[in-house]
Amino acid sequence: MRPWRCVSMAKAPAAPSSTQPDPVSYEAALEELEQLVGRIESGQLPLDQMLAGYQRGAVLLNFCRARLEAVQDQIKVLDEGALQPWVQE
């Protein structure tokens, strides 16, 4: 008997690089993240691209969270250290 070995029949398209730069804004990161989630959820990505997309998504999510925390901290400073409850007018 011959031992099994994995042979790739076709090369998958290049996966997004995990060294992509941070987005320029929260809005750009959110838009890229939404598009990425759509591609992943479609089920049409090869496994390698799905993994790379997941990794990029984690980077984008961390970027968005950091920006939101920074804005929240700035609001606390403007509100004298206490985050005020939102009251819709």
UniProtKB/Swiss-Prot annotation:
Gene3D superfamilies xrefs: Exonuclease VII, small subunit
If you read the UniProt record, what top EC class would you report for this enzyme, in one word?
hydrolase
Q: Which GO terms describe its biological process?
A: DNA catabolic process
Report the main location listed first in the record. Answer: cytoplasm
Where does this protein reside within or beyond the cell? Answer: Cytoplasm
Q: Which keywords appear in this protein's UniProt record, sorted alphabetically? A: Cytoplasm, Exonuclease, Hydrolase, Nuclease
Q: Name one Pfam family in it.
A: Exonuc_VII_S
SUPFAM superfamilies, per database record: XseB-like (SSF116842)
Chain's role: Bidirectionally degrades single-stranded DNA into large acid-insoluble oligonucleotides, which are then degraded further into small acid-soluble oligonucleotides.
Q: Which protein is depicted? A: Exodeoxyribonuclease 7 small subunit
